[in-house]
């Protein structure tokens, strides 16, 4: 990153270039949730304090070129069964994003810890190659990945983007490329990535060597609709494949201040030789997900997520009510209802109740968040 800064200082003319400034924002959130039927010798309450700070601004400006930056830092303090079961550390200080970007109207080059996110899936995201966000969480947060990314804006409706991500095993790199464009009236994108074995444990499939390719397409005809798919080809032992796809639709009904309903169907299937990470060793499974949200007035908004596994009959229902105390201070009432229609509580994909805390147990909680 130091080399990156020095390069642009040297090669961009110095007259009227320096334009360093800084802005900041962030939020503090604290809350606790009561775990129904917490595992034996585990605490009943899972509590968290989360502090998030973001600094951004410009470093250099020359004609149409801008060199800017963003630094995000976060602190988590956790207590409860998620710590006792080693799902989360008791204390965690980390940098979700730290990057430099050189850009103009036609291109941008960005280096550092950054988000690499694309695709149209909302609940299920086959193209979330570097996605860690829980969209049903109170304050969803996506971690960045250390990388170099270059984007060319070919027109107002099309772009070409490439990236390199250190795999953290020797000198191995994860290279990828994607293109977004309009296909008639449909927003369309394609992606290709080579994925060597890596130490990036925050992301799925890190232990496999794969070629990954996919597409997404989105349109609107009274209702919104989209499809997003990914094909993984494992390099060993005989190039077996895994295919993930999601079909989604949404519509806002003119009920009250607008009732938004979204539905997605997700299918994952793989050949026998593909390295499976499913707890049951099942090669094919499919989920359906719903979300509904509606503002009641300026101060109150409710939402609910519902997920169901057709194969093992497990489910999750995640309601939340947001109450705006002021423009910057919010109160969240949230819960989680997990279960299994077949009565199997030990190894569902969406619900598990065992002697160890899994994070899928039913709960009810309260969180306060202050944004600044």
Residue ranges of each PLM-predicted region?
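Transmembrane beta-strand segments of Gram-negative outer membrane beta-barrel proteins
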Residues: 19-37, 67-69, 158
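Transmembrane beta-strands of outer-membrane beta-barrel pores
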Residues: 30-36, 57-59, 71-79, 104-106, ...
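Signature for the C-terminal beta-barrel architecture of outer-membrane proteins
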Residues: 21-24, 60, 64-66, 105-106, ...
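Outer membrane beta-barrel
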Residues: 58-160, 181, 340
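Residues on the lipid-exposed face of transmembrane beta-strands in outer-membrane beta-barrel proteins
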Residues: 51-57, 97-104, 148-152, 177-181, ...
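C-terminal structural cap/anchor segments
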Residues: 257-322
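Surface-exposed strand-loop-strand hairpins of Gram-negative outer-membrane beta-barrel proteins
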Residues: 31-49
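Outer-membrane beta-barrel "beta-signal"
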Residues: 323, 328-330, 335-337, 355-372
């Amino acid at each position: 990153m130091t080399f990156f800064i020095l390069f642009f200082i040297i090669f961009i003319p110095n007259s009227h270039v320096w334009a360093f400034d800084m802005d900041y924002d962030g939020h503090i959130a604290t809350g606790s949730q009561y775990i129904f039927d917490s595992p034996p010798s585990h605490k009943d309450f899972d509590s968290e304090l989360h502090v998030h700070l973001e600094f951004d601004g410009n470093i250099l400006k020359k004609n149409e070129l801008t060199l800017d930056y963003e630094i995000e830092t976060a602190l988590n303090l956790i207590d409860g069964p998620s710590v006792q079961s080693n799902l989360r550390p008791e204390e965690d200080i980390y940098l979700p994003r730290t990057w430099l970007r050189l850009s103009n109207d036609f291109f941008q080059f960005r280096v550092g810890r950054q988000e690499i996110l694309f695709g149209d899936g909302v609940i299920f995201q086959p193209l979330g190659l570097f996605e860690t966000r829980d969209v049903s969480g109170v304050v969803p947060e996506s971690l960045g990945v250390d990388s170099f990314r270059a984007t060319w804006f070919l027109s107002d409706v099309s772009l070409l983007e490439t990236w390199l991500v250190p795999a953290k095993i020797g000198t191995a790199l994860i290279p990828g490329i994607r293109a977004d464009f309009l296909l008639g009236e449909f927003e369309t994108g394609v992606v290709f990535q080579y994925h060597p074995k890596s130490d990036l444990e925050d992301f799925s499939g890190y232990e496999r060597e794969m070629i990954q390719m996919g597409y997404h397409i989105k349109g609107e005809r009274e209702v919104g609709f989209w499809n997003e798919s990914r094909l993984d080809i494992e390099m060993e032992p005989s190039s077996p494949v895994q295919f993930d796809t999601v079909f989604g639709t949404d519509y806002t009904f003119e009920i009250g201040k607008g009732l938004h309903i979204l539905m997605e169907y997700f299918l994952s299937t793989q050949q026998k030789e593909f390295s499976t990470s499913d707890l049951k060793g099942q090669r094919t499974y499919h989920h359906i997900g719903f979300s509904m949200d509606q503002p009641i007035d300026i101060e109150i908004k409710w939402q609910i997520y519902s997920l169901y596994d057709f194969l093992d009959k497990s489910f999750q229902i995640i309601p939340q009510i947001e109450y705006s105390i002021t423009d910057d201070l919010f109160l969240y009432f949230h819960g989680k209802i997990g279960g299994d229609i077949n009565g199997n509580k030990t190894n569902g994909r969406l619900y598990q109740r065992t002697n160890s805390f899994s994070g899928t147990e039913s709960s009810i909680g309260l969180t306060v968040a202050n944004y600044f």
